[in-house]
Amino acid sequence: MSRIKILTDSSAQLTPEEIEKYDITVVPLSVTVGGNTYLDGIEISRQEFVKKMSESAELPKTSQPSIGRLVDTINDLTSDGSEVIGIFLAKVLSGTIDAARQAVKLTGKSDQVHIVDSELTDRAEGLQVLEAARDAEKGKSISEIMDHLEKIKKTQRLRLMIVNLENVIKGGRLGPISGKIANMLNIRIELQMPNGELKVAKKGRGKKFMMAFDQRVLDDIEANKEKIKEVGISYVSLDGVPQKLLDFAQKIKDINSKIDVLVRETSPIIATHAGMDAYAILYYTE
């Protein structure tokens, strides 16, 4: 029986240990910030990106991996007869999945390579990657793994709190006048990604709104505490891990000590969309 290998992109929130343990192949996105372009995770770290983003007058840009890199990666992974499941960030956020599909056509390996739109990014994408890798390790078939991924997608959650609207304004989602007023009013925005679409869920003012957001997430985790194995908490910060998020992680552990919680800096694509001090909670129910 042929081996099943897992392929993903650098926006997936995975630790170096996880990548090594499951032999996951990660293709880097490109990020342009401060007039220079870097390969995400290879030529620039997440912390370095956030620092450069904070110093840049222009909104950073992220670009999908090149078709050539994807073709080379697919040819390499399938050269021994292995099958590949490629799990990529939501199409609404990047053209990466379209590039991957095009690369599969160019290689003529559509019978060996199976492409999945995670419909999210960051740790939500990462959790799909990990479950696929674990399934492959257990000897499950391609169809079994693909079915499992579809089940995960139906219950996955991404709750994103935008604290600083500067990047939202730079990106044109708020006009300069509306943005200035929103900043003056201390407006915060909650984003979600139902069915792979980026949506504004709620808007509110100041710390009370953020506290209510946090409590809603904790209430949902409490209600599903026996169905959740892992929670990702991702953030954008110049000063390391915010204490608030470490406290939040502990509250999750207090709800159910068996839930694994990963607190980690987010990828450039989320940092670009969300801006400084943003944070996201990501998980799914079984």
Give the label of every model feature segment.
Residues 3, 11-25, 30, 96, ...:
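Mixed-charge interfacial surface used for oligomerization/domain docking
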Residues 5-7, 84-86, 266:
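Short glycine-aspartate micro-motif
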Residues 5-64:
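N-terminal glycine-rich anion-binding loop in soluble enzyme alpha/beta folds
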Residues 7-8, 88-90, 117:
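Short beta-strand segments
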Residues 52-55, 81-86, 106-117, 263:
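Glycine/charged-rich beta-loop-alpha catalytic/anionic-binding loops adjacent to active sites
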Residues 55-90, 98-99, 146:
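Glycine-rich phosphate- or other oxyanion-binding loops that anchor nucleotides, phosphorylated ligands
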Residues 93:
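Conserved catalytic-site region of short-chain dehydrogenase/reductase
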